């Protein structure tokens, strides 16, 4: 987020297609792949150490996953998909960064700053002055500012504003809305997965990791889901007890979680 300057964004837009094209040229270089394949196919006769075998397998699979075994026509299709994906993913990130910089919470009453760290308050005052709002405080939903507000702000309405501002990032129907980017990325990822012999992009993404299959990964997640939810419910119950005991007078909501988690932890 700290690098989200117009200059850095312009540089990323210039370099992204170059980096993508270079990567494709490496992974779809037939002469280079054939050398890797020769070592891979004859690993048993070459006296490779376990580490060398592992490295050979790793690079062989990486090249295959990036289109080394595709026909020339399919490689051209994959290159086109990769180029479009790179542009869309960069647009997605730029939209998020632009939203973080331009969608913010303005505070004009110092009483609402209770509980916030001085560094956060000072930074918000400077940002407000930079935006022509001297005497006020501007809080963006950047990670450091957002967490400071959600964790420390005694003003519940400020926590709620910050939470909702963050949750609406790049999803407000304006020029930075990422809905179209997301839909286009999903379609292209599916095309890429099928081109490389996978049923879905999830299957493609999970293939090189320990779980190996989408079902295995889903089963793993579901196995920890119930105990995780139970633990969170217990934590929220403790927070609610603390809130009730200190006269909060409301039910704990998402924007209250970090604040009361810190209060309970400090007891």
Model-derived segments and spans:
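N-terminal helix-rich structural modules
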Residues: 1-118, 123
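Active-site-adjacent "gating/activation" loops or surface patches in catalytic cores
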Residues: 130-169, 257, 262-264
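Alpha-helix N-cap/helix-start motif at coil-to-helix transitions, marked by capping-box chemistry
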Residues: 50-54, 153-156, 183
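Active-site-proximal, well-structured secondary-structure segments within enzyme catalytic domains
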Residues: 55, 84-87, 94, 98-140, ...
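A ubiquitous short alpha-helical element
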Residues: 41-51, 145-151, 171-177
């Amino acid at each position: 987020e700290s690098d989200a300057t117009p200059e850095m964004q312009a540089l990323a837009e210039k370099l992204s297609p170059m980096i993508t094209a270079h990567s494709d040229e490496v992974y779809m270089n037939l002469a280079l792949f054939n050398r890797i394949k020769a070592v891979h196919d004859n690993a048993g006769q070459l006296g490779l150490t376990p580490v060398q075998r592992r490295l050979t397998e790793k690079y062989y699979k990486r090249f295959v996953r990036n289109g080394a075994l595709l026909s020339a026509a399919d490689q051209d299709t994959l290159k086109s998909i990769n180029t479009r994906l790179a542009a869309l993913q960069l647009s997605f990130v730029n939209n998020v960064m632009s939203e973080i910089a331009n969608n913010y919470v303005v505070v004009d009453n110092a009483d609402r700053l209770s509980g916030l760290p001085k560094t956060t308050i000072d930074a918000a005052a400077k940002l407000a002055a930079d935006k022509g709002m001297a005497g006020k405080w501007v809080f963006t939903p950047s990670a450091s500012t957002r967490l400071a507000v959600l964790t420390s702000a005694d003003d519940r309405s400020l926590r709620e504003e910050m939470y909702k501002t963050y949750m609406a990032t790049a999803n407000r129907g304006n020029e930075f809305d990422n809905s179209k980017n997301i839909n286009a990325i999903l379609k292209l990822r599916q095309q890429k997965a099928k081109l490389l012999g996978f049923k879905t992009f999830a299957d493609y993404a999970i293939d090189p990791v320990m779980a190996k299959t989408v079902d295995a990964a889903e089963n793993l997640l579901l196995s920890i889901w119930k105990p995780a939810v139970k633990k969170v419910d217990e934590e929220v119950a403790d927070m609610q007890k603390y809130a009730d005991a200190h006269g909060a007078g409301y039910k704990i909501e998402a924007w209250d979680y970090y604040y009361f988690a810190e209060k309970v932890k400090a007891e």
